[in-house]
């Protein structure tokens, strides 16, 4: 019952984001003006100093992810086992196949053999190629807890934040160089959102971290994206308005 309720909540959030998050994830299609706004909608954990056991711990999680991914080279097997594609009809660089049951469990307990999402790339023939996995934690988890799961000296967990839902009649303002709403918009505060008649969400989803265990470059194994080209400047200290509210 609790898992079903959690799934319904996730479905409601997915509906809220439909039509905006897909474009966000497909960053190569976004104009430079929009990119400057994205920093106000993502919080990334700062890198911590490396501790003696951090690399070993991170390597163990990556190995567990690789083993968990092994049965799902064929995306149809993932679908058959309860993974659902997030926004399958929206063009994206990476497609998240999410198992809500694992997402619920991850809010209370970390099991690296049960990644919340499998990450696929669309292939030219319309199929999907498995490239990575995603682990999650609840919104209110502390950075110390995240560090216990995957060390913050190696991986940077992230949250999507400061989402202003557009009022009826203004949904076109989710997009374009003058976007105001959503994950690409210029609005990053509750006050500004209210002034434009929107509904403000301090954060959407919870904590996330991506792992790409097939990568040979250690820097790419724990990158936010498999090419990780747009998050380099999104540091903990360089982003105004990024503190989380509960």
Indicate where each model-derived feature is located.
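Primary mode marks residue(s) on the alpha4-beta5-alpha5 output face of response regulator receiver
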Residues: 34-246
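Bacterial N-terminal signal peptides that target proteins for export
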Residues: 2-10
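Bacterial N-terminal signal peptides
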Residues: 11-20
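Signal peptide processing junction and immediate N-terminal pro/mature segment
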Residues: 22-34
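Composition-driven recognition of long, C-terminal low-complexity regions enriched in serine/threonine
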Residues: 9-12, 32-36
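Residue-identity detector for glycine
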Residues: 19-22, 241
């Amino acid at each position: 019952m609790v898992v079903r309720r959690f799934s319904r909540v996730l479905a409601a959030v997915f509906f809220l984001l439909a039509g905006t998050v897909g474009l966000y994830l497909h960053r190569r299609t976004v104009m430079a003006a929009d990119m400057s706004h994205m920093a106000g909608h993502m919080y990334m954990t700062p890198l911590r100093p490396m501790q003696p056991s951090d690399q070993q711990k991170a390597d163990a999680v990556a190995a567990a992810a690789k083993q968990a991914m092994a049965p799902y080279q064929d995306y149809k097997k993932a679908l058959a086992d309860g993974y659902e594609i997030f926004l399958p009809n929206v063009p994206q660089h990476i497609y998240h196949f999410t198992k809500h049951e694992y997402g619920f469990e991850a809010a209370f307990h970390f099991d690296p053999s049960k990644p919340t999402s499998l990450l696929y790339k669309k292939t030219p023939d319309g199929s999907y190629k498995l490239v990575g996995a995603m682990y999650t934690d609840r919104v209110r988890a502390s950075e110390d807890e995240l560090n216990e799961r995957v060390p913050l000296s190696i991986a940077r967990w992230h949250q999507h934040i400061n989402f202003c839902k557009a009022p009826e009649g203004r949904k076109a303002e989710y997009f374009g160089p003058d976007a105001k709403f959503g994950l690409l918009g210029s609005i990053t505060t509750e006050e500004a959102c209210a002034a434009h008649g929107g509904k403000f969400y301090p954060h959407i989803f919870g904590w996330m971290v991506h792992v790409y265990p097939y990568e040979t470059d250690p820097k790419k194994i724990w990158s936010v994206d498999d090419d990780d080209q747009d998050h380099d400047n999104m540091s903990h200290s360089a982003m105004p308005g990024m503190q989380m509210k509960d």
